[in-house]
Amino acid sequence: MKKRFVLFVVTSLLIGLASTSFAAPVVDPVKVGLSKDLIYFVFPDRYLNGDTSNDSFPGYNPRDTAFFHGGDLKGLTGTCSDGDNGLARIKKLGFTAVWVTPLVVQQKPTPNGAGYHGYWGVDFLNVDPHLGTKADMVAFAACAKKLNLKLILDIVTNHTGDVISYNDKTAFLSSDLLNAKNPAWLNDLSNYHNVGSMSNCWGDGPCIQTGDFFGLDDIATEKPVVYNGWADVYGQWIKDYGISGFRVDTARHVDDAFFKNWSPQINAAAKSVGIDNFTIFGEVWDVNPINLMNYVRRNKIQTVLDFPFQRTAAEFAAGYSDATVVENLFAYD
């Protein structure tokens, strides 16, 4: 049975990050730098409101779960010495790493909700003002370093927030949104697939990689300007804040060669600031271990979230199956 990289998170059962091995031997085993860490997963907006001055931005409504609730980086950082709050409390609980949802600037709120979760990014070079400032991020990272807590950042490369509109299947930007995104290459429509929703192709089919995920603008991740651009963006986050790992959202929806082109640049950025064994783990929503294996081997994702184990463990814990189901999963894996 292979070694399993297991995440302990506050919002779910155990989730494994696995470099799937199956029949063919792995000649050069992947080193996962977080393999011995206990990881605390947190939405900063839902942790603690440490700075009420940023509650005035549009999209703040703590009475509605679809909007910002006021949690921020100051609230998550805490005093950095009192074990009853913030990062110091997380450290006191026994965790060795903190995984935060995306911190980048989100698209403007709609009547139906706001990007409190971080997955509707438009400005990938700055911190969303609801969560704080770059100075707050520096303080957050410094506190984590002081407490010897590794930082894991949730990132998105497949899409941006929903800015592009369509007129009779022709993509366009309204005049007030021509420069809505940062960096500038994200404002070039030629860097998107512009084919509309992927809602009709959740299984096989080309639009699983080219269609808009829940209406979000799908980026042409096969283009050098895109994968090199993302390497510059996220490499800078590593250099500025000492990030130890990335969880890559919607990893199954990017181009098959994306990780081959992007990951080496990210690892180089990490090594340039003395971070060895930088960990990249992808969110590939699939409960078939063989399918996950293909993303690791074929697409060269370093490792992926182990959703087959999550499902099996949850069903066992809920009493829907007995221990033999868990045993069979390990034997099969």
Show the residue positions of the predicted features.
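Bacterial N-terminal signal peptides that target proteins for export
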Residues: 1-9
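Extracellular/periplasmic catalytic domains that process cell-envelope and extracellular macromolecules
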Residues: 31-36, 90-94, 99, 118, ...
